[in-house]
Structures are given as C-alpha cells and as structure tokens.
C-alpha cells in the first residue's frame, strides 16, 4: 500500500478486526484469532500512546450493498461509547469502490467522511463498532492504521 498526501502507510502499524453476518446490528467488530464470534476479544491493547491515522474497510456478501443509507462507525477506547469517541459514516453504494462482485472497499484518512485522527493512551483498548445501521451487512473486515508517538 502506498502513501497519500497526508498519510504515509509505510510508517503505520495495522490492527485487524472482522465480523461475519452483521445483519442490521450495531455491534463490535472482533479480533479474528480463529473466528469472529462473541467469544473473541473486541479490542487491541495499545502498548504506548498514539493516533489512529486511517481506516480501511472491506464489506462483502450477497446483502452488500443493501441500501443507499449511511453506515456509521465508531472508534472507541475501553468499551466507552458515550464519550471520547470518533465517528465516521459512508454509503456503500456511493462511497465505496466495487472491486469485484459483492466486494466493496474504502480507505478513510483525516478529514474524510467525518473522520479525524483519533488519539489514545498507553494501555487503552482500541475498538471499532457500527453505531448506526444503514441496512444489512454480511461480512466486514477493517484495519485501523496506527502511528505511535
């Protein structure tokens, strides 16, 4: 992956999340260490402070795209959904790239789709969840691209 004007992906660490059969739920993506079910952890502990600099997502499956509504996502720390979160939204039909069949991808950096770089501290648990459903989703993969201080 190359660089953009604002984000040098070669200097970033990536943290992977996924969820199968999301449906219309507002649920956490999981760390897929042998699956992505409820028993899997839903966050990565951060070894030092830093910032989420970018997000890449892949949505796939027969229900994708399902509507022309925005799907709203929330990056949060330590399971707290009420304060100190970063939300962004996109429409699968108009904002994502259809790479093949029912596979749609997007890369979001600072200033796009309502996203601003998101700061965290050492020891924080970094999580992502869909906070508002724009319709049914099948499979979602997400990478949070992080730069440590």
What are these language model-derived features?
Residues 7-73, 78, 129-149:
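Beta-sheet-rich sandwich/jelly-roll-like modules and their strand-loop junctions
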Residues 1-7:
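Viral virion structural and adsorption modules
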Residues 3, 24-25, 101:
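Intrinsic-disorder/low-complexity loop/linker signature
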Residues 89-90, 110-138, 143, 148:
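Terminal, low-complexity interaction segments
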Residues 60-122:
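Terminal beta-strand-rich extracellular "head" domains
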Residues 11, 20-22, 93-95, 109, ...:
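Short linear sequence elements within intrinsically disordered, low-complexity coil regions
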């Amino acid at each position: 992956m190359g660089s953009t004007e604002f984000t040098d992906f070669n200097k970033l660490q990536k943290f992977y999340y996924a969820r199968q059969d999301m449906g219309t739920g507002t649920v956490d993506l999981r760390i897929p260490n042998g699956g992505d079910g409820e028993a899997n952890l839903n966050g990565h502990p951060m070894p030092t402070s830093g910032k989420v600099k970018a997000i890449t997502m892949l949505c796939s499956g027969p229900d994708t795209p399902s509507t022309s509504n925005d799907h709203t996502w929330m990056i949060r720390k330590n399971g707290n959904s009420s304060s100190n979160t970063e939300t962004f939204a996109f429409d699968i039909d108009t904002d994502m790239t259809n790479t093949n069949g029912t596979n749609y991808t997007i890369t979001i950096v600072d200033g796009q789709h309502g996203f601003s770089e998101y700061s965290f501290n050492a020891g924080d648990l970094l999580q992502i969840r869909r906070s508002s459903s724009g319709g049914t989703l099948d499979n979602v993969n997400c990478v949070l691209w992080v730069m440590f201080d």
